[in-house]
Amino acid sequence: MTDVIRAEGISKSFGPVAALTDISLHVGRGEILGLIGDNGAGKSTLIKILTGYHQPDGGRLLFEGEPVTLKSVVHARSLGIETVFQDLAMVDDLPVYLNLHLNRELTHRPLPFLRRGEMKRRAREALDSIGISIPSVTTEVGMLSGGQRQAIAVARSVYSNAKLLLLDEPLAAMGAKESAVILRLLQELKQRGDIAIILIAHNYGQVVDVCDRVNLVQHGEITFDRASADTSVAELLELVNAEYRLGGGQ
């Protein structure tokens, strides 16, 4: 399996506070890596480094086997690194097809008129290609369920030819039915075999079920890296709780 992204010995500090210490991870095409850990463990900082928002103080990144310095979020996106956050960054009163093309609108150059017909067609094709069921691409996003909205956010990244997709708590505040929509979508993307996925989640059952491997981040370090088939929710909970007890519950 070819690694899409590989981090080697990544460190990051903010003033006297060490956010990451000697972090190494990798994820390849057709693979889902689960990233777990308590709030403040360093997951968000790591994601921001992988998406060009922060630059590391030490270590290096390799993208598709080549050393890379991600200078900005825009630079990372130009390489095919896309992120879906919990807040989605979508416009509720715009229809699905315009949200899917947000900041990527098709126009009749040199005139600034939108090619709405083609945008609708491409939006429908993008949704159908990964099995997302939406009654109409002209429906306003604000009228959809949380699971449908999150699915559209994922589809937007895939439509942008993502090679690495990072999902930051995509299932937070979702019910079981809506979560199932996203978990099925992730499995569909995995089966395509052309996208590497990093999933940050607090539901360890979902992580074990959908991910190929699990990394546990504690105090800015990866302390656990194992295939999901070789671990369990009980083991992950014990690792986190043991660290919590050793820390005196702080």
Language-model features: locations:
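Glycine-rich phosphate-binding loops of nucleotide-dependent enzymes
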Residues: 2-250
